[in-house]
């Protein structure tokens, strides 16, 4: 895992190359910036000397970029680390509030996945 928070791109590239030499299966790079520019710059620079090692990104902050755009810069894997969890919290909060208001769960039934569907999902995994 590499981050620009420490010492910038040159340091990140140096560490990435060292990780590859040490046997890393891939390089994960992350940034808190809203712009993907430093990630793209890193990927372009890394790909100049290493075309094989997979690059993994987690576009939580720089979420406007598409997977296709990332791929053009040599990214192999995109991880949406917390978007599903963050989407689930408002729904869980609303259901919890309604249960507290009504002192039962009947009023939230239409917002729940059935147990049968959950079990079917588990069976298919």
Which stretches of residues belong to each language-model region?
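Alpha/beta enzyme core
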Residues: 1-80, 87-97
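Extended, intrinsically disordered, low-complexity segments
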Residues: 83-125
């Amino acid at each position: 895992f590499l981050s620009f928070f420490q010492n910038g791109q040159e340091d990140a590239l140096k560490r990435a190359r060292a990780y590859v030499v040490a046997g890393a299966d891939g390089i994960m790079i992350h940034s808190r910036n809203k712009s993907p520019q430093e990630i793209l710059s890193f990927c372009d620079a890394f790909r100049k000397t290493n075309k094989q090692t997979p690059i993994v990104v987690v576009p939580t902050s720089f979420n406007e970029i598409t997977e296709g755009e990332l791929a053009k810069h040599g990214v192999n894997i995109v991880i949406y680390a917390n978007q599903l969890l963050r989407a689930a919290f408002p729904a869980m909060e609303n259901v919890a509030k309604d249960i507290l208001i009504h002192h039962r769960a009947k009023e939230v039934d239409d917002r729940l996945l059935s147990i049968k569907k959950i079990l079917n999902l588990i069976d298919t995994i």
